Curated annotation (Swiss-Prot):
InterPro entries: Imprinting_Balance_Reg (IPR053052). PANTHER family: CHAPERONE DNAJ-DOMAIN SUPERFAMILY PROTEIN, PROTEIN ADMETOS. This is Uncharacterized protein At4g38065. It comes from Arabidopsis thaliana. The lineage of its organism: Eukaryota, Viridiplantae, Streptophyta, Embryophyta, Tracheophyta.
Length: 191
């Protein structure tokens, strides 16, 4: 093969649609590479294309299987990641239904869509039951609780002034306002 033939083959390789590249990478379980292609494609496209639904399907597969393969630092499975939910937040049925539509085998023909759907169903079956979810949250909070303590900052004003305002019925007559007799405390910060 001459160098010209090799060069022409190299030029045609980028002509593959990004979604087909994703399909090929999915077959070899290269989920992080697929996610990278999806992110780059989202940055480059400003208009909605026909492939966008397919990219969403592929992204859902990657998100779920990455979460399923990578355990949390304390060794537990990341069930929140398997349903694409925030940790310790509410688990919403609407979000899970959207996810199951993306992974539905009638419409999603990408490799591992069924495996991702099975893992999402398992995670949902655990996190949708309040007692099991509470137990799981408690188990993972030992790790994440300590991490979040470091990040939390509490605002405490340096200096406070306390002002007490007392009003009586005589003020009503003097100012022509309807003032209710009361005592209230207003707090503010001095700069």
């Amino acid at each position: 093969m001459s160098t010209r033939e090799g060069a022409s083959q190299n030029r045609t390789a980028p002509d593959l649609k990004p979604i087909e590249t994703c399909r090929k990478l999915l077959k070899s379980r290269e989920f992080l590479s697929v996610r990278y292609i999806i992110q780059v494609n989202q940055l480059l496209k400003s208009k909605r294309h026909d492939d966008d639904d397919q990219f969403e399907q592929v992204e859902a597969i990657c998100d779920l299987l990455i979460a399923a393969e990578n355990r949390l630092p304390n060794g537990l499975k990341d069930y929140y990641g398997m349903i694409r939910a925030n940790r310790f937040g509410p688990v919403l049925l609407e979000d899970f239904e959207k996810l199951t539509k993306l992974l539905d085998k009638k419409h999603n023909y990408f490799p591992f869509s069924q495996e991702a759907a099975d893992k999402a169903s398992l995670a949902w079956s655990l996190l949708s039951k309040p007692p099991i979810k509470a137990h799981y949250d408690l188990a993972i909070s030992a790790f994440f609780g300590e991490c979040s303590k470091v990040k939390r900052k509490i605002f405490i004003p340096k200096k406070q002034i306390e002002v007490v305002v007392i009003s009586d019925d005589d003020d009503e007559e003097e100012y022509g306002h309807k003032i209710i007799s009361m005592a209230r405390t207003a707090r503010g910060c001095r700069s």
